[in-house]
Amino acid sequence: MINIAICDDDITTTGKIEEMLCRIAKRQFIPVETDVFWDGKHLADAVKGGSRYDIIFLDIEMEKENGITAAQKIRKVDRDVLIIYVTSHENYMQESFVVRPFRFLLKPVNEMYMETCFRVACEEVSNSDSYFRYSYQRLSHKVPLRDIVYFESKREGGSRTIWKTQ
């Protein structure tokens, strides 16, 4: 399962990107879960609060908090997430390199470019062994391996529980 966040202050754009990604993922037989955010602050707060994403599609110029500031906050918590900027503003490209973006897509997004970018990003995610992935209560989770000290498994009422300690 690839966990994706989409963040843009234009609701129409987030809808188009989400629909496009779902079509592409279906064609490539890649299961995805998407969360949509309409400002960088809520996305950064979600990541700080424990939400983990493999790929973030992020606009740069947004009203409340721009994509570069949001990415800087996200990088403090998750150094490995792939950030793909989706923007109409090429002039911010050099400024954004401080947060190590994976790719840039220019608006309006061409589905062929999106598919190529998504495929390469998914290959990068699948080649990355830096996370322990598991499902619990129908939700997919990923924990950075560097944060895991040990695993402990207990049987309570027929179910298994895995504990993570930092």
Task: Report residues per predicted region.
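Switch/coupling loops of ABC transporter nucleotide-binding domains
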Residues: 2, 32, 81
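Conserved acidic segment of CheY-like receiver
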Residues: 2-21, 56
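A structural preference for long, well-packed, hydrophobic secondary-structure segments
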Residues: 3, 19, 36-42
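Conserved SAM-binding loop
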Residues: 6, 36, 85-86
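Short, well-ordered amphipathic alpha-helices
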Residues: 15-24, 43-44, 71
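Short hydrophobic/Thr-rich beta-strand motif most characteristic of the beta2 strand and flanking loop
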Residues: 25-39, 46
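CheY-like receiver
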Residues: 42-128
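Conserved binding/recognition cores within well-folded domains
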Residues: 116-166
